[in-house]
Amino acid sequence: MSITSDEVNFLVYRYLQESGFSHSAFTFGIESHISQSNINGTLVPPAALISILQKGLQYVEAEISINEDGTVFDGRPIESLSLIDAVMPDVVQTRQQAFREKLAQQQANAAAAAAAAAATATSTAATTPAAAAQQNPPKNGEATVNGEENGAHAINNHSKPMEIDGDVEIPPSKATVLRGHESEVFICAWNPVSDLLASGSGDSTARIWNLNENSNGGSTQLVLRHCIREGGHDVPSNKDVTSLDWNSDGTLLATGSYDGFARIWTEDGNLASTLGQHKGPIFALKWNKKGNYILSAGVDKTTIIWDAHTGEAKQQFPFHSAPALDVDWQNNTTFASCSTDMCIHVCRLGCDRPVKTFQGHTNEVNAIKWDPSGMLLASCSDDMTLKIWSMKQDACVHDLQAHSKEIYTIKWSPTGPATSNPNSNIMLASASFDSTVRLWDVERGVCIHTLTKHQEPVYSVAFSPDGKYLASGSFDKCVHIWNTQSGSLVHSYRGTGGIFEVCWNARGDKVGASASDGSVCVLDLRK
């Protein structure tokens, strides 16, 4: 048996990624030199650290259950071991001794009962339920009258999976599960003009899935392998694909990777150009509406505007003092960026300083989004607040405090001024590690609905194109569809892995979701 520090570090790194601690994972990866190890991450299955810990725990429990002569105790352990208990020798020895004493007591009781039975063989049998119960106590593991199991239990801090109402549950016939990725799928996005779904994964590939009705009944996939040049050859980068975005006419797909490169692909899967100027992983990238520029944010503390036609960097913006986490265009040449430095900068192509800087968050700013009119900027943070900013003032317009844990992402509804649904009020959705989604009336600065069916952190929210529905995805493996006016749950689907991303197609009749177990699912919401 051999265990190297590189192997341990890699499993810890993957655990941090899979658990949503992306910033911690990045920092740990740098300090432990993960990128310099020779471990092929695409071959390591999801949840590998948990799996090996469970096996180790089972080994310790088996060790407790074996006699000194090698024979196995006949019975179950008194109580399931926790992971912390298993690494404490005193606890293990105490459990082992208690187990032996309990078995000795059971054997003594059995012998006494046998003797008593022999002595009273001619007595009348007990007829009352209480007496019968006393004579036949439930064995460890059998159910008692009230349905509770006899004996002690391991404590589970997670709630049981919520029962899904049959009226809202999406049947398997309406769910298509797309398999092919060999690692967790961090992101997915529909083509804006056709039913092509793009996905990005930890297996160093993006994929384009054809879900159009005329695609021969099934779904075909194009594999977009992210390679780097080594010794004159293209070799897999073995780095996560963590961001992707279609241009507005659906002809090109941009991807961002932990290998530090952004790439542009055609819709038929051919690599059009590679954009290389970041010094480290890319956390976010976005096309502008016109389709001539791509914007990227990197761990190197910079943001870059790229010329989509030539692949050249038009301008690099080095204003953050820590990794840049998200970017969003206000118009075709002006954008906002946020960072772990707690600041938000608004920058413009051609300007060598930010045109505006917003300060007020007291922890990392995870996401930023301009409203459809480009007048208001929303931001969310690990400080548990959601803030609304205007270019007309320095202080935030609203400081919305209701979540009890970090807010991971936010989305504006496609309603109100400057949208195709101008007669509907604009809303803002926020998704948090407190397992809730909140819908906000931004004009009044109040929470309209708190959506509480999820049992684990919520990583993604997305509005339907008409703004009438909101999809949410959580690490509890569930995708929920909500009515935005009433706040009621209208559809629900339980997948096979924690949900990292949800997205709607352009018609608003399909929802895509990407998961931690490598699956991508498509939910057909047509009647």
Swiss-Prot record:
Q: Which organism is it from?
A: Mus musculus
Give the Pfam families listed for this entry. Answer: LisH (PF08513), WD40 (PF00400)
PROSITE patterns named in the record = LISH, WD_REPEATS_1, WD_REPEATS_2, WD_REPEATS_REGION
Q: Changing D382A: reported impact? A: Affects recruitment to heterochromatin by MECP2. Does not interact with MECP2. Is efficiently incorporated in N-Cor repressor complex
* Main localization (coarse): nucleus
Protein name, entry field: F-box-like/WD repeat-containing protein TBL1X
All copies of the LisH domain together span: 4-36
Where N6-acetyllysine occurs along the chain? K102
Glycyl lysine isopeptide (Lys-Gly) (interchain with G-Cter in SUMO2) cross-link: located at K290
A single Gene Ontology biological process assigned to it is: response to estrogen
